[in-house]
Amino acid sequence: MYISELTVEGFRAFNQPFTVKLNKGLTVMVGENGAGKTGVISALRQLFVDSEAGRYAVDDQDFHLGFAVGDARAQSFKVSATFSALDMAEKLAFMAWEDIDHNTKLHLHVETREYRARPKRSLWAGKTKATVEPEVLDLIRCIYLPPLRDAEEKLSNGSRSRLAKLLKVICKKDLLKHEDDGTDHPLVAKVKEFNKELAECDDYEIKKANALISDSLKKAIGESLAQGTRIQFSESDFSRIVESLRLLYFPDLSAVDTSQFRSLNENSLGYNNLIYIASILAELHLESKLPDQDNGLFHLLLIEEPEAHLHPQLQTRLLKYLADTAQETGVQVIVTTHSTVLASAVPMHAIVHMTAGAPPVATRLAECGLPDKSERFVNRWLDVTKSNLLFARGLMFVEGIAEAILLPELAKLVLKAQPIGKQTLHDLGVSAINLNGIYFKHFMQLRNVSMNLKHLVE
């Protein structure tokens, strides 16, 4: 099961009906700034409850507002998702979402009015446009990682600790068994035993410190008003115990003493981001092996700019692992990026190109109709430098290095009379792409379909 198509209207940059087709497994969304990549991610988040941050609240800025003088903000927006490749269990679970054409779809309609304190949300599906049951929606797990991630905060101890969430998933089966038996989980029993030893043993001075506090309290307010005190490491409850745990790091995998591990606030931003993402992927791998509706039937992982704080080698390794995770677990992974490293590290069919416009245009490169020979050539040809063609506003394909150097200089002469900021190809967002040969035919159909560019081939 995966989301094969998303349709948006009236939401952010999407003033008119906009449709993007997505891949089963990994989708990498590329394009220039302001092309609508974040808008697609935000539209998906409107449909589901984010397991990291909860429901994505509707904001006034979510309603489209054009830039022309006199444009008014949209009074409503619509988001629809189409699901494909459902197995039998998924078909049964989401049967109520089938429309008259037997397509499984989820629809959201949000309206705003000046007299309303907050927008009205209508989430519906199926032939009868019935309201979606929360229990059914909870079968879809959505995890969103924003571009500016505070990985250290997410990995710190506390009620929202990512480490605690992972441990609860790992121990879920055992916790249910001990709850039915009326017994303590081994971790809880061990902590209780340790806390009892601390409180009662004279060797640690804990007992003495607690007695001093208790005596001072009784002297201050009297025995009839005083409260009992006890010094221990944690409350004897599984959730509280795992929420108090801290994740530490050491810079390599060599065998070291535990005292050499350090707090994550001493680690690099890039590695903290990797540890955070690794904890999420570990949970997804684990849940994929537990055929339990409580773990969700479908998982959606949305990551904006996974390249944040990572050098090129780590970017490539991370994206490969994301692709492997999608294939092994059935998780649908949707990534947005401005990294030519990531864009060149995936096959062409995984890429969706976004072009700025009113509305933006999304092109799934797998549907550009390239012959197999051309597709194989483009996949081999794209590298970190040449994948710039996926992000440029305009393109100039040239045969060799001489043209790549000469044409931008000629453009400066032609454009010198233009206002400042429009006097070079770079100013205009145009890239000269050196093909190192006369391979134009492999690229013209790709670019014509995705960006409708004019072209000249000698």
Segments the model singles out, each with a brief description of its role:
Residues 1-49, 249-387:
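Switch/communication elements of ASCE P-loop NTPase nucleotide-binding domains
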Residues 41-100:
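Conserved P-loop NTP-binding catalytic core
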Residues 49-75, 285-296, 328-329, 334, ...:
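Flexible phosphate/Mg2+-sensing switch loops adjacent to catalytic phosphate-binding sites
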Residues 74-79, 102-106, 138-142, 298, ...:
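Short glycine-/polar-rich loops that comprise or flank the Walker A/P-loop
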Residues 78, 84-189, 428:
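Electropositive, glycine-dotted interaction segments
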Residues 81-83, 146-149, 235, 249-251, ...:
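Flexible glycine-/small-residue-rich
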Residues 151-158, 164-303:
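Extended helical coiled-coil dimerization/tether regions that scaffold
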Residues 327-328, 341-344, 348-457:
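RecA-like P-loop NTPase motor core
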